Every structure is written in C-alpha cells, then in structure tokens.
C-alpha cells in the first residue's frame, strides 16, 4: 500500500507524470537598494577623504613689513591639516568609509536570517554615520565660507582668492561627503520603511 502512495523518483505519482519547477525567490527590492546605498556610501566617502587628504597648494605671497621697504615674497603652503575642521572632515569620511565596508560584509553575511539585535545594531550605526558626516560637513563648510568671503567684523581676510585650487578641491570633497551622508541617511529611511512594512503585516 505504501509503495502505491509514494511518488517515483522520475516524478510519476499513481500513473500521472508531474512536472515540478522550483523557482528561486528573487532578492527583494529593499535588499538590493540597501546594497547599492552601501556601495555608494563606501565609494563617496572614500573619494571625499582622498580628495581632501591630498589637498595642498603653495603660493608666493608678497609680504610688506615696512611701507618704505619693498615687499618680501614668501612661499606659503595651504594644506588640509592646518585647520581642525578639515582634519575632522577627512577623519570622519575615513571612519564612514571603513564602516561602510564592514557593514557591507555583515549585511551580506546576515541576509534575511540575521537576528533582530544584529540588524538593529547596524541601523543604529548607520544613524551614527549620518550624524558624524553631517557634523563634519557643517564644520568644514563654516570654515570654507570664511575662507571664501572672510569676515570684515573681525578683519579676517579671505584666502580662496589666493589659494584657489586648494579651495576648489575642498568644495569637491565637501560635495562628495554630503552625497555620502545622504547615502547613509537613505539607509536609515529604508530601514524605517522596512520596519513599518513588517509591523503593518502583523
């Protein structure tokens, strides 16, 4: 009796041939979006850190000590390590880049089988990266505005009219860093959307 009820190896059950097609479930859109955003965050923060980290320009500046004497021409170098705000920008992007690489590996390994605690830890760290990058971008932007326009109230002169290449590289680094912070912000928003979907389906 048991042999009559069991299907044969070739897919024949009680004299009727059946064709079973196994279809793998495609990766969800949310997982694909998360992967893309982490790759973008990794690349953007890496390039931002490199662009700012190699930023350096030397110019010959005329220096007048006494009005009756001719000006002295002194070589002056502007580099990112001269200002703490720019150091903060480079270090923050380096941290975010390293975290993006590690989180990319973790998320790939965890997949859908990841425990809730580990997934929540990644989301919290994503949120920390958003705060870190936005604070670094804000600090560097404030110093950059002073370099571009100066401050007449405290007699701070603008320097970007002299070190133009230096300032242009910093603007490019800031733009990349800002886009990188938006990538991490997108990850946080995506996580909130996924949590909302899970709670609504329960």
From Swiss-Prot:
It is a multi-pass membrane protein. Homodimer and heterodimers. This is CASP-like protein 1E1. Residues 55-85, 140-172 are extracellular. The keyword Ribonucleoprotein does not apply. The chain crosses the membrane at residues 34-54, 86-106, 119-139, 173-193. Belongs to the Casparian strip membrane proteins (CASP) family. It comes from Vitis vinifera. Residues 1-33, 107-118, 194-202 are cytoplasmic. InterPro entries: CASP/CASPL (IPR006459), CASP_dom (IPR006702), CASPL (IPR044173). GO terms for cellular component: plasma membrane. It is found in: Cell membrane. It comes from the Eukaryota. Keywords: Cell membrane, Membrane, Transmembrane, Transmembrane helix.
């Amino acid at each position: 009796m048991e042999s009559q009820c069991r299907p044969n190896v070739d897919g024949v059950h009680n004299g009727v041939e059946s064709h079973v097609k196994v279809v793998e479930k495609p990766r969800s859109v949310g997982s694909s979006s998360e992967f893309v955003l982490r790759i973008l965050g990794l690349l953007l923060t890496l390039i931002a850190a490199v662009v700012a980290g190699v930023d350096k320009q030397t110019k010959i500046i005329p220096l007048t000590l006494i009005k009756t004497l001719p000006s002295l021409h002194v070589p002056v170098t502007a580099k990112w390590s001269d200002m703490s705000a720019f150091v903060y920008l480079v270090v923050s992007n380096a941290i975010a880049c390293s975290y993006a690489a590690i989180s990319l590996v973790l998320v790939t390994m965890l997949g859908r089988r990841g425990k809730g605690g580990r997934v929540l830890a990644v989301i919290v760290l994503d949120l920390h990266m958003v705060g870190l990058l936005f604070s670094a971008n804000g600090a560097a932007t404030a110093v950059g505005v002073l370099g571009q326009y100066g401050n007449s109230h405290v007699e701070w002169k603008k320097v970007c009219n002299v070190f133009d290449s230096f300032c242009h590289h910093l603007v490019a680094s800031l733009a990349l860093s800002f886009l990188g912070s938006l990538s991490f912000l997108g990850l946080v928003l995506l996580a909130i959307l996924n949590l909302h979907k899970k709670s609504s389906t329960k």
